[in-house]
Amino acid sequence: MTGMHDTIFALATPPGRSAIAVIRISGPAAHAAPALFGAACPAPGCFQVARLLDNSGMPLDEALVLAMAGPRSSTGEDVVEIHTHGSMAVTAAVLRMLGDAGGFRPAVAGEFTHRMFANGKIDLLGTEALADLIDSETDRQRLQAWRQLDGALYKPVTGWREEMVRLGGRLEALIDFADEDLPPSVEAQLRDDSNALIRSIEGVLDDGRIGEQVRNGVTVSLLGPVNAG
C-alpha cells in the first residue's frame, strides 16, 4: 500500500451513466479540493451546492459538496465528497482535474478501507464483513455480512478470551496449591467450565462452515441420462 499521508481520490459509485456519481477524497489536502473547481469547502459536517468550473472557467456541473474532518470521518482523515450528476463526461473531467492538480493521487484498490482499518475505524473482521456485504447477492448473504459487521463474531471471541484468562488463573492456582487438601469439586468444576468453552467455540466453528457455504455458494452436480429433461 502506498503512502498513508497522501491525499487520495476515487469514484465511489459504479462507473457509467447514472443519476448521481460520488467522488470521494481523503487525506490532509482533501479540504482544498473544492477550490480546484472554483468552489468553497463547506464547514466540517456540512454540505452545500456548488457550481464546479473547469480549468478554463467554464461550468462543469452543479454538485453537492460535503466535508468531514478527521478523526470524525469514515477514514479517520479529512474527507470531501463531491456528488455530481452521473455523466461519464463530468466524472471523467473531475477525476482528471484532481489528478492533474498535484497533491492528489488516485486511490489504489481497497485503499479507503485500508485507511479505515489503520485509523481504528474498523477491525479486521469488519473489513472482511464489509467486503462480503458489498459482494452479497442474496438476502441471506447480506444478513450474514451485516451480522458480522455488527459484531456477531467479535463479541463471542472477546468473551472466549476473557473466559480463557479466568480459567488460566484458576488452573495456576490449582497447580500452586496442589499439595493442599482441596475438594475434588474444584478440579471437576474447572474441567466442566473448560469443556463448556470448547463446546462454545466448536459451535461457532460449525456455524462458520455453514457461513462459508452461504458466502461462496454450493457446487451442485446434475446427473442423469442424456436429454432426460
Q: Model regions: which residues?
A:
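Long, non-coiled-coil amphipathic alpha-helical linker/lever segments
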Residues: 121-200, 204
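Conserved G1/Walker A P-loop phosphate-binding module
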Residues: 6, 17, 21-26, 36-40, ...
